[in-house]
């Protein structure tokens, strides 16, 4: 079973692991301010009204800001901390520290911007919420407000391509043109609703690799997500006999950016299937007036190669930083001495 490099989508890691971020954990729920009894159980009371969900989704720079998407595939509660979107699962909170001001340039350039100080303030607010025990920040850099015991991932970056006003003006290299031409002889691309053979293709991929439970949950909720979110579109590639050769899902909720979230293809799909699916996804974005196609994180050299084939460039750096709100206890003599002398 093979899979096309996808846009990365939601960050999938278990809240029980050392590197925790957004973890799908069941069907979407209503905002917590509709359930006053949750506050008595320790939930914060600064939940967002639906109008703020729409504002974040309209200006989304990363998938975790697509509120309909996250709510369709998870049980996370949307909050707002210091003007940034955050997601809560019990004692764990994920702060999405990407916004319009925190994008182009390297990490050091980002740190010099006023928005960096705003992110640090949001980290402080998130850390002080009642019942929060662990915090993960998704941002272009490691926040200065992160404590010394915080753990950061290897720096990555979101990649993307600008979309012209006319699909005929897409900038393809000759090799990509040839692949698209070849694929179009063997497959037909069309928009479809979620079907059993889409689910089976996903299950084949899940069975082929030892995915974490959160990853399997996310993949198995692609169908409910496509069915629940009007601007989540599925493009399917089928051969002349109607057999499914692959599919891709794009999210068009944001006003200016299309997000390439998922892509799967059959093991023996014709060459260029992945490219033909992405081309259809981009063409729909152009038709709708979008100006940017977000291809997700680099992840590994193979996925970066796929993006570069499409003349993609880095949109913004990305680092995940996670920590326990309370300093972990140090065992042994050193920990005892530090406690004794107030260190």
Please provide the spans of the model-predicted regions.
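Short, basic, low-complexity termini and linkers enriched in Ser/Thr/Gly/Pro
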Residues: 15-23
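Acyl-donor-binding surface of acyltransferase catalytic domains
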Residues: 28, 112-188, 192
């Amino acid at each position: 079973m093979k899979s096309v490099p996808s846009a990365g989508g939601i960050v999938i890691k278990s809240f029980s692991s050392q590197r925790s971020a957004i973890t799908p954990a069941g069907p979407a729920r209503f905002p917590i301010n509709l359930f006053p009894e949750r506050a008595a159980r320790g939930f914060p009371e600064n939940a967002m009204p639906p109008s703020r969900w729409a504002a974040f989704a309209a200006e989304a720079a990363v998938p975790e800001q697509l509120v309909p998407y996250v709510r369709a595939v998870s049980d996370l509660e949307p909050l707002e901390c210091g003007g940034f979107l955050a997601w809560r699962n019990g004692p764990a909170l994920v702060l999405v520290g990407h916004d319009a001001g925190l994008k182009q340039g390297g990490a050091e350039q980002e740190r010099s911007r006023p928005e960096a100080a705003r992110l640090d303030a949001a980290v402080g607010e998130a850390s002080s919420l009642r019942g929060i025990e662990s915090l993960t920040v998704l941002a272009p850099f490691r926040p200065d407000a992160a404590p010394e015991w915080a753990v950061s991932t290897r720096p990555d970056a979101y990649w993307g391509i600008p979309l012209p006003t006319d699909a005929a003006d897409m900038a393809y290299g000759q090799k990509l043109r040839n692949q698209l031409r070849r694929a179009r002889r063997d497959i037909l691309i069309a928009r479809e609703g979620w079907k059993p053979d889409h689910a089976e293709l996903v299950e084949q991929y899940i069975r082929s690799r030892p995915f974490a439970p959160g990853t399997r949950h996310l993949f198995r909720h692609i169908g409910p997500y496509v069915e629940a979110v009007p601007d989540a579109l599925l493009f399917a590639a089928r051969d002349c006999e109607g057999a499914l050769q692959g599919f891709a899902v794009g999210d068009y909720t944001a006003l200016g950016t299309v997000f390439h979230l998922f892509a799967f293809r059959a093991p023996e799909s014709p060459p260029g299937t992945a490219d033909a699916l992405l081309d259809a996804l981009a063409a729909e974005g152009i038709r709708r007036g979008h100006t940017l196609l977000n291809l997700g994180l680099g992840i590994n050299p193979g996925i970066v190669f796929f993006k570069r084939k499409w003349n993609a460039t880095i949109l913004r750096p990305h680092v995940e930083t996670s920590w326990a709100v309370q300093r972990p206890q140090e065992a042994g003599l050193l920990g005892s001495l530090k406690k004794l002398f107030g260190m």
